[in-house]
């Protein structure tokens, strides 16, 4: 799953679908559902976080307004959120998908996200533990210095 999440869309594909998207927008003032999806699909696979976020926004709009493709939209919402390390949102979309139907690829993505959440929690605990040690050391040093000062004054 990690390999799939790290796979990046070729720049020429992204540019082609971006051009198609903007062409339809300029021509008709509206973009077809298929073109929106193709563009969003490329964006969530971009190497740039802002592109991924833009793809997520398009997919969210599609999921709200076009229930026919909701299954695909929800999967790529989970996928895009996992790519930008928005694991809580990614997990929410995985669960929403699995409520619709069982799918091994989505289960695999869900497991990957859960492992990444566990890693983040562990990192947070290490940082908190390190901060507590530093604070304890500073407090201990302060107490030792105060005692030393009291001894000198006597």
Curated annotation (Swiss-Prot):
Topology Cytoplasmic: residue spans: 1-124
Example of a GO MF term: molecular adaptor activity
Gene Ontology annotations for the cellular component aspect, listed alphabetically: mitochondrial outer membrane; peroxisomal membrane
Alphabetical list of CDD domains matching this protein: Fis1
Organism placement in taxonomy: Eukaryota, Metazoa, Ecdysozoa, Arthropoda, Hexapoda
Membrane topology: Single-pass membrane protein
Comment on protein domains: The C-terminus is required for mitochondrial localization, while the N-terminus is necessary for mitochondrial fission.
Family listed: Belongs to the FIS1 family.
InterPro entries: Fis1 (IPR016543), Fis1_cytosol (IPR033745), Fis1_TPR_C (IPR028061), Fis1_TPR_N (IPR028058), TPR-like_helical_dom_sf (IPR011990)
Name of the featured protein: Mitochondrial fission 1 protein
Signal peptide: none
Record key words, sorted: Membrane, Mitochondrion, Mitochondrion outer membrane, Transmembrane, Transmembrane helix
Traits of the deletion mutant: RNAi-mediated knockdown results in elongated mitochondria.
């Amino acid at each position: 799953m990690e390999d799939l999440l790290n796979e990046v869309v070729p720049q020429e594909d992204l540019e082609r679908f971006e051009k198609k998207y903007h062409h339809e927008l300029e021509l008709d003032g509206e973009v077809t559902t298929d073109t929106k999806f193709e563009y969003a699909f490329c964006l969530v696979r971009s190497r740039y976080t802002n592109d991924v976020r833009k793809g997520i926004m398009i997919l969210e709009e599609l999921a709200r307004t076009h229930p026919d493709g909701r299954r695909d939209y929800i999967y790529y919402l989970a996928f895009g959120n996992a790519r930008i390390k928005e694991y809580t949102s990614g997990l929410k979309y995985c669960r929403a998908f699995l409520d619709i139907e069982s799918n091994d690829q989505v289960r695999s993505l869900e497991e990957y996200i859960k492992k990444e959440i566990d890693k983040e929690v562990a990192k947070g605990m290490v940082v908190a533990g390190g901060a507590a040690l530093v604070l304890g050391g500073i407090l201990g040093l302060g107490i030792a210095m105060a005692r030393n000062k009291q001894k000198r004054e006597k």
